Curated annotation (Swiss-Prot):
It is a single-pass membrane protein. Keywords: Cell inner membrane, Cell membrane, Membrane, Protein transport, Translocation, Transmembrane, Transmembrane helix, Transport. GO terms for molecular function: protein transmembrane transporter activity. This is Sec-independent protein translocase protein TatA. Belongs to the TatA/E family. Part of the twin-arginine translocation (Tat) system that transports large folded proteins containing a characteristic twin-arginine motif in their signal peptide across membranes. TatA could form the protein-conducting channel of the Tat system. Forms a complex with TatC. It is found in: Cell inner membrane.
């Protein structure tokens, strides 16, 4: 995960704890989780749209070549 070891992650978590306090951590984690969920949803939608366009292109080329023969 980004080349970070266990000690580095613990240090980062301690710094976050000091900066935001224990009361804000659940709120921050919830916001981060929602953001990641939205990002993954958008990524999936883009992949599905891309795949549908790629799948349509050979069909159009196939029907065009069969009508020309």
């Amino acid at each position: 995960m980004f080349g970070l070891g266990g000690q580095e992650l613990i240090l980062i978590l301690l710094i976050i704890l000091l900066l935001f306090g224990a009361k804000k951590l659940p709120e921050l984690a919830r916001g981060l989780g929602k953001g990641m969920k939205e990002f993954k949803k958008a990524q999936t939608e883009i992949e599905e749209e891309f795949n549908s366009v790629v799948d349509e292109k050979p069909k159009k080329e196939k029907t065009a070549s069969s009508t020309q023969s």
